């Protein structure tokens, strides 16, 4: 018997982000495939890797120590390190992958004859790539794991290799779940983190060619991100008249919430590839809008504003910071520039004489955690709205385009007048 949808009780007090609620939806338990497809998703770069590396028996034996459904692209890494003549290599990865860091370190030291440095600081996303610290540690090469090429390799201080760590999952169960929960011919926006990007394009092709129950999957794109890729601060604006629902593939809600904030009128679902649960997700857009409006209103009366540049890797953008400083000063507002690697309520509470803060780091810090600070903490977009240099949001649209081609995260000044 198919399980009935069960609504989780919405929390009355928001304590950590606007988590909202979720409900479970139908899953095809009978069609479970017990083992994931272990075929590696290999790019065209494989053709460029010398055969002596691809066929190195000792190297391939060492690679077997890593999980078979995680593609750490060891062959490509070895080839790039050798090709660039690197001597000291930094390895940067999110906390969830640090368990594999020593195995990778040993492999690279043995087969590349280099010294490796495992960077232990937090890495929340591609914006946190820390080539500055790597260079300070005398590294001449850095491998950044599990995130896309958000920061171009031609502007970093040392050579960079991005390894997406694509993960193979049980595609058939995901396909069966989508077919069970949506009507034939449905147009669905499907996206996820970069790890599951190959899966998204694979199931898109299979469902579009499914004669029994054809589905039309659309991997939305926000340039310059990949099709089907979503970030916690950057997602595509979708046409609610064309898209029946949004499906996010990944664990957690952080990235999905970006699309939910950007498209509050489109139903959202999440498929967790680890638990294989398919849930309908909810976000309290109204409450978020009210909290952000209050923050901007209070900050508009500020005489002294703390302008924070995020120093966690390349999270902060100096161009955006300088642009905000110029506009604030032109309004007669005193500016105090602050550099912080991580922004905590306790730390900002020490600045007693500052009336409000604007952080050029991660917009989700303000959206998710703004209520926890004793003074307003605005994003660059909210600050520009306050200064009447950008169009204000409304209940059906709050832009999530921070790292888009023309976004504030790239030092640009986007124009939202045509979408709000």
From Swiss-Prot:
Cofactor note: Binds 1 [4Fe-4S] cluster per subunit. The cluster is coordinated with 3 cysteines and an exchangeable S-adenosyl-L-methionine.
The protein's Enzyme Commission number: 2.5.1.108
UniProt cofactor(s): [4Fe-4S] cluster
Keywords: Cytoplasm, Iron, Iron-sulfur, Metal-binding, S-adenosyl-L-methionine, Transferase
Record's protein name: 2-(3-amino-3-carboxypropyl)histidine synthase subunit 1
Origin: domain of life: Eukaryota
GO terms of molecular function: 2-(3-amino-3-carboxypropyl)histidine synthase activity; 4 iron, 4 sulfur cluster binding; metal ion binding
Reactions catalysed, as given in the entry: L-histidyl-[translation elongation factor 2] + S-adenosyl-L-methionine = 2-[(3S)-amino-3-carboxypropyl]-L-histidyl-[translation elongation factor 2] + S-methyl-5'-thioadenosine + H(+)
Location(s), subcellular: Cytoplasm
Chain positions recorded as [4Fe-4S] cluster binding sites: 127, 233, 362
GO cellular component assignments: 2-(3-amino-3-carboxypropyl)histidine synthase complex; cytoplasm
Assembly notes: Component of the 2-(3-amino-3-carboxypropyl)histidine synthase complex composed of DPH1, DPH2, DPH3 and a NADH-dependent reductase, predominantly CBR1.
Pathway note: Protein modification; peptidyl-diphthamide biosynthesis
InterPro entries: DPH1/DPH2, DPH1/DPH2_1, DPH1/DPH2_2, DPH1/DPH2_3, DPH1/DPH2_euk_archaea
Residue stretches in coiled coil: none
Family named by the database record: Belongs to the DPH1/DPH2 family. DPH1 subfamily.
Disulfide topology: none
GO biological process: protein histidyl modification to diphthamide
Primary localization class, coarse: cytoplasm
Protein's job: Catalyzes the first step of diphthamide biosynthesis, a post-translational modification of histidine which occurs in elongation factor 2. DPH1 and DPH2 transfer a 3-amino-3-carboxypropyl (ACP) group from S-adenosyl-L-methionine (SAM) to a histidine residue, the reaction is assisted by a reduction system comprising DPH3 and a NADH-dependent reductase, predominantly CBR1.
Species this chain originates from: Debaryomyces hansenii (strain ATCC 36239 / CBS 767 / BCRC 21394 / JCM 1990 / NBRC 0083 / IGC 2968)
